[in-house]
Amino acid sequence: MGLPFIVLNYKTYLQGTGQGAMEIAKACKAVSEESGVEIAVAPQLPDIYRVASEVALPVFSQHLDGIGAGSFTGHVFGKCIKEAGAVGTLINHSEKRLTLAEIEASLKAAKEFGLRSIICTNNVPTTAAAAVLGPDYVAIEPPELIGSGIPVSKADPEVVSGSVEAVAKINPRVKVLCGAGISKGEDLRAALDLGSQGVLLASGIVKATDPKAALEDLIRLI
């Protein structure tokens, strides 16, 4: 197994807003260059262009709507985020839930504009359903553990291993990420040992006093 893929979701944390978004992205780039680990960031929409323009690392959108050009006020258009510099998008995060039809439409839009896709799920059945759709990644995140500081890899390891097994049976080209409560090296190591190929995390890094040090701790056991 190669090095893991780490995706850092800024959410709307103050520490990851505006200039803070830039500083965290620079920390991610430094750690990525030092370690060889691919680290992507998902800043707020208005910060995508700035981060993508000034820091050479993968930038994801936190959301994408399954719409095209036209009368869709307030929606997130795939072509717009692609031209702003995004290379991928989260879909169906537990804080931005979508219906199955909306997930399919968002994934279709991501594929249309060449964006890497991460569909977030909350249990093994939803992971299996997401795998059928054929995204690049599914990220298993039980919502009750998000932001808790309690890693899913320890609190509910079966949901991770079960998701890995389900995806392998349905569509082995889809990669599995592990999320919810991930913040330390032990958490990432446990997630990888359960079969995931990376992690989706947020507060443990974004809200850290020293994000670079927190990232270095995260990868120290791989």
UniProtKB/Swiss-Prot annotation:
Pathway info: Carbohydrate biosynthesis; gluconeogenesis; Carbohydrate degradation; glycolysis; D-glyceraldehyde 3-phosphate from glycerone phosphate: step 1/1
Residues forming the catalytic site: 93, 141
Keyword Transit peptide: no
Keywords: Cytoplasm, Gluconeogenesis, Glycolysis, Isomerase
Keyword Isomerase in record: yes
EC number of the protein: 5.3.1.1
Binding of substrate, residues: 9-11, 146, 181, 202-203
GO cellular component terms listed in the entry, alphabetical order: cytoplasm
Compartments, record wording: Cytoplasm
GO molecular function: triose-phosphate isomerase activity
Classification via Gene3D superfamilies: Aldolase class I
Catalytic activity: D-glyceraldehyde 3-phosphate = dihydroxyacetone phosphate
GO biological process: gluconeogenesis; glycolytic process
Main localization of the protein described in the UniProt heading: cytoplasm
Family statement drawn from the similarity comment of this UniProt entry: Belongs to the triosephosphate isomerase family.
Known partners and oligomeric status: Homotetramer; dimer of dimers.
HAMAP family, per the entry: TIM_A
Protein purpose: Involved in the gluconeogenesis. Catalyzes stereospecifically the conversion of dihydroxyacetone phosphate (DHAP) to D-glyceraldehyde-3-phosphate (G3P).
Protein name per the record: Triosephosphate isomerase
Naturally occurring in which organism (per UniProt): Methanosarcina barkeri (strain Fusaro / DSM 804)
Encoding gene per record: tpiA
